[in-house]
Amino acid sequence: MAIWQGASRRLSTGAKVWRAAKKHKREMGRPAAETQVSDKIKRKIVRCRGANLKVKLEKTNYANVFDQANKVCKKVVVTNVIDNKANKHYIRRNVMTKGAIIETEMGKAKVTSRPGQDGVVNAILLTE
């Protein structure tokens, strides 16, 4: 069954709301990509509104980490997810979202991109 992002058919009181118009394709949604740390890199290309393409990153073990002190950006290996404010269960499953703290070869880094929307993991190195 499709994910529908339209208004609910019920009011807060429980009364049924009758539709003024039918459901439209523009109101459909998709499940989240939930990018995981894995040895294999897996991307999914999805057609979105306006016949545009969106690259969803499903699995990866690399991130582009920017070192602010040296002004250098490097492609490094991600080992695991240390903290994720989006969902506490994402830490155990190694799911990367924007704002997640990841462990890399260079040290701890904070994800600044949206991997499920952008198709790449960009991060900033944290100073300890």
Swiss-Prot record:
GO terms under cellular component: ribonucleoprotein complex; ribosome
Keywords in alphabetical order: Ribonucleoprotein, Ribosomal protein
Assembly with partners or alone: Part of the 30S ribosomal subunit.
Gene name of the encoded protein: rps8e
Record family assignment: Belongs to the eukaryotic ribosomal protein eS8 family.
One MF term in the entry's GO annotations: structural constituent of ribosome
Alphabetized InterPro entries for the sequence: Ribosomal_eS8, Ribosomal_eS8_CS, Ribosomal_protein_eS8_arc, Ribosomal_Se8/biogenesis_NSA2
PROSITE patterns: RIBOSOMAL_S8E (PS01193)
GO biological process, alphabetically ordered: translation
Pfam families associated with the record: Ribosomal_S8e (PF01201)
NCBIfam families in alphabetical order: eS8
Protein name per its UniProtKB record: Small ribosomal subunit protein eS8
